[in-house]
């Protein structure tokens, strides 16, 4: 039998994990890292799109997820989600973003689930003028015979209106949940959403750093990447269209979701910053500029013991020929560099040793030829601290059948001092109980019947989740009320 095992761990960049091993980006460009080195592929659907009446959208943001073997599950460009067969996923069209958003989308597995994924999107300034905001859809990978689909009624759900094109995620300090992070437009506010096994359960707002301004009627100051360090303790963002330009890094508490202690590393108010990435060991920060200040710059976050003045003084130009745009850390431990937005420039740059200081980071220009397919502005958006340990490609049973659901009885509801689970199946199952904060308060393996003492639990709503070895997932909620009265 298979048992659910949840391991608490510190967020690390795990080179052994393969869920970020396939990339689709740019103008039908792609890379496959499953062999250990990137292999160029061109079979994806991500590409330039018509944004009439505004023209052709630049290819900037996409998101992809694979299973633990590196096999593709699905991917998205902000407006459309495709399944592993490169067909539009069931209910996967008409998402409210476009590929022209810097970080148009982010795919996050629901903690504790091998079946459900959250697809987050941020709108773009070019085609939509940011009107659709920050939204999410829930994907059930077992729909459509295992090809996956967006659940009816769980699509384009609004979390926050008018955000920038910045979107990233961090593993929670508990090693299970995630923080999904965006930046409010025309504000200095970070909004951090906690995703747990029961859904989005908490929002933390931190007012820190620069206001991302509206300049006249123009929302183009929403562009630029936001990234988290692999250990989840730092954030960095850039905005090269603002006046003055913005380049900052922050402390991030991945237990509370609080952003604090801004440090500005903007050294020229006219530079056009776009891309940002941390090294795998969290010690170096890279920033890419296009147009004014074109180049890739390294900042040593350990300089002077992390003293901000020393960090700014450590700035080193490591690449300086083209208009450099998006940066992305890959599972091979290297940082990939989009060199130019123009069609016809089909080469990527690579920072081969990003942990090393200065030019010893070994930037290689034109390192990868994409076979005529331009990278354009950016790369797929990943959580660099992913462990993906609960991402499973198998979907043996598909959607839980009604007969399976009817096998489970949870009583009494409301409950007081005892809660009972009755599962009319002779197989072992694992039941987990979570409070409204998403904290697991109970986990137990049983066969057929289990009754547990709940006197220690506070009154309130609790969420249960049942799993068996067929990866069937059944969920529900129960209410804890005061002590039961004994009848006489």
Where are these regions (language model features)?
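Short, flexible active-site-adjacent loop segments at beta-strand->alpha-helix junctions, enriched
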Residues: 8-9, 123, 484
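Intrinsic low-complexity/disordered segments
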Residues: 14-16, 399, 436, 440-441
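Intrinsically disordered, low-complexity segments enriched in proline/serine/threonine
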Residues: 13, 40, 414-416
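Long, low-complexity intrinsically disordered regions
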Residues: 396-401, 407
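C-terminal outer-membrane/trafficking sorting elements
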Residues: 404-411, 415-488
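A general lysine-centric signal
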Residues: 2, 334, 477-480
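Sec-dependent N-terminal signal peptides
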Residues: 3-12
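Beta-propeller fold recognition
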Residues: 17-398
């Amino acid at each position: 039998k298979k048992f659910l095992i949840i391991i608490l761990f510190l967020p690390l960049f795990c080179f052994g994990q393969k869920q970020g091993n396939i990339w689709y980006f740019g103008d039908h460009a792609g890379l496959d890292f499953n062999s250990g080195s990137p292999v160029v592929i061109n079979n994806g659907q991500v590409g330039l799109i018509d944004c009439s009446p505004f023209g052709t959208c630049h290819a900037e943001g996409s998101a992809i997820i694979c299973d633990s073997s590196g096999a593709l599950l699905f991917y998205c460009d902000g407006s459309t989600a495709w399944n592993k067969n490169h067909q539009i996923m069931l209910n996967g069209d008409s998402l409210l973003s476009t590929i022209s958003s810097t970080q148009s989308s982010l795919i996050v597995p629901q903690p504790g689930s091998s079946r459900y994924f959250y697809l987050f999107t941020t709108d773009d300034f070019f085609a939509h003028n940011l009107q659709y905001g920050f939204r999410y859809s829930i994907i059930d990978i077992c729909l459509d015979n295992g090809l996956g689909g967006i659940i009816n009624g769980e699509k384009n759900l609004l979390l926050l209106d008018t955000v920038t094109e910045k979107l990233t995620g961090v593993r929670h300090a508990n090693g299970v949940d995630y923080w999904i992070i965006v930046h409010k437009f025309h504000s200095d506010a970070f909004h951090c959403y906690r995703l747990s096994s029961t859904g989005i359960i908490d929002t933390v707002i931190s007012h820190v750093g620069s206001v991302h301004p509206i300049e006249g009627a123009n929302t183009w100051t929403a562009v630029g990447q936001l990234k988290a360090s692999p250990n989840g303790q730092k954030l960095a963002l850039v905005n090269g269209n603002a006046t003055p330009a913005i380049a900052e890094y922050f402390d991030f508490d991945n237990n509370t979701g609080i952003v604090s202690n801004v440090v500005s590393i903007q050294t020229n108010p006219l530079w056009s910053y776009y891309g940002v990435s941390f090294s795998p060991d969290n010690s170096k920060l890279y920033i890419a500029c296009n147009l004014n200040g074109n180049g890739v710059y390294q900042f040593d976050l350990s300089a002077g013991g992390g003293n901000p003045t020393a960090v700014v003084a450590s700035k080193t130009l490591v690449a300086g020929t083209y208009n450099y745009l998006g940066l992305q850390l890959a599972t091979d431990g290297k940082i990939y560099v989009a060199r130019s937005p123009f069609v016809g420039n089909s080469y990527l740059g690579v920072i081969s040793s990003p942990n090393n200081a200065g030019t010893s980071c070994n930037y290689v220009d034109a390192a990868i030829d994409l076979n005529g397919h331009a990278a354009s502005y950016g790369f797929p958006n990943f959580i660099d601290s992913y462990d993906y340990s609960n991402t499973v490609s198998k979907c043996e049973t598909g959607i839980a059948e009604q007969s399976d659901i009817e096998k489970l009885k949870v009583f009494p509801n409301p409950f007081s001092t005892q809660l009972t689970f009755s599962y009319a199946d002779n197989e072992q199952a694992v039941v987990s109980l979570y409070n409204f904060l998403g904290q697991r308060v109970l986990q137990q393996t049983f066969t057929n019947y289990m009754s547990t003492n709940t006197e220690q639990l506070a009154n309130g709503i609790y969420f249960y989740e049942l799993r068996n070895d067929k990866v069937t997932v059944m969920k529900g909620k129960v209410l804890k009320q005061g002590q039961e009265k004994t009848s006489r």
